[in-house]
C-alpha cells in the first residue's frame, strides 16, 4: 500500500505518490476541481494514506474527500498552521493564509535561502521567506489570465485570450497580453527590489502555477517549479506526528 498527495485547485487537480519528503511523478487533470466529476472512480489511486490540500469550493472539496475516503484507510486534510517544518507564517491569524501559499513556502524553505515565492494561478501571489524560515508576508493580485477575463467581461470586444508579449504592441491582442503579463512582472520585480532592501540580500525567485510558463521568459534568473505545492504537501506529511 502507498501514500498519495492530492492538490485540489480552482483550475487544476494534481496528485502524486509520496516519495520521501517530496512528490513523485505528478498526474494532472486540466479542468481542475469541476472536471473531477467527469472522471471514472478507478482513475484515482488507492492506498494507505491520502494527504489533501484544497482551495476549491467546499462542495467540490467534500465530493473529492468522499471519493478518497472510499479508497484510502486514512485521509488527512492540510490546514495552515503558524509554524511547520521550520517555517513561521507572518499572518497574525495563520488560518487566513491560503493553504496553497503555505505549502509552497514549506517546499521553498528546504533550500534554506531567501526566496520570493510566486504563484500564478487564478490569483498572482507573492510571498517572501528568509533563510531562517521566517515568512515576511506577501501580496495578492489578479493573475494575467484573470485580468484578461475581467476585461473581456466588461468589454466583450477585448479578447480574453491570444496575443504575444511586446514592449510596445501594435495590435489589441498583443497589447492585452503585454499589459497583463507586464503588470504581473512589474509587481514581481517591485517585490524583489523591496525584499532585497528588507533582507539586505537579493532573494532567489521561485515560480509555480499554471500561468507561470507565460511569465518565465520575462523573469530572467527565475526558477520554475511546477510541483511546488505538492512538494510542500509532502514536507507537511512527513512532519506530522506519528499516528
From Swiss-Prot:
Q: How does it assemble?
A: Homodimer.
**First-level EC class:** transferase
SUPFAM superfamilies xrefs:
Actin-like ATPase domain
Q: Which NCBIfam families match?
A: baf, PRK13327.1
Top-rank taxon, per record: Bacteria
Which residues are listed for substrate binding in this entry? Answer: 91, 98-101, 172
Q: List the subcellular locations.
A: Cytoplasm
Q: Which InterPro entries match?
A: ATPase_NBD (IPR043129), Type_III_PanK (IPR004619)
Keywords (alphabetical) are: ATP-binding, Coenzyme A biosynthesis, Cytoplasm, Kinase, Nucleotide-binding, Potassium, Transferase
Q: Which GO molecular-function terms appear in the entry? A: ATP binding; pantothenate kinase activity
Cofactor: how bound: A monovalent cation. Ammonium or potassium.
User: Its biological function?
Assistant: Catalyzes the phosphorylation of pantothenate (Pan), the first step in CoA biosynthesis.
Q: What is stated as this protein's family in its record?
A: Belongs to the type III pantothenate kinase family.
Which Enzyme Commission numbers does its entry carry?
Answer: 2.7.1.33
Q: What is this protein called?
A: Type III pantothenate kinase
Amino-acid positions noted as binding ATP in the UniProt annotation, renumbered to this chain:
7-14, 122
Needed cofactors: NH4(+); K(+)
Q: In which pathway does it act?
A: Cofactor biosynthesis; coenzyme A biosynthesis; CoA from (R)-pantothenate: step 1/5
The coiled-coil regions, if any, are none
Its UniProt entry gives the catalysed reaction(s) as: (R)-pantothenate + ATP = (R)-4'-phosphopantothenate + ADP + H(+)
**Gene Ontology BP terms:** coenzyme A biosynthetic process
Q: Which GO terms describe its cellular component?
A: cytoplasm
Matching entries from CDD domains are given as: ASKHA_NBD_PanK-III (cd24015)
Catalytic-site annotation from UniProt? 100 (proton acceptor)
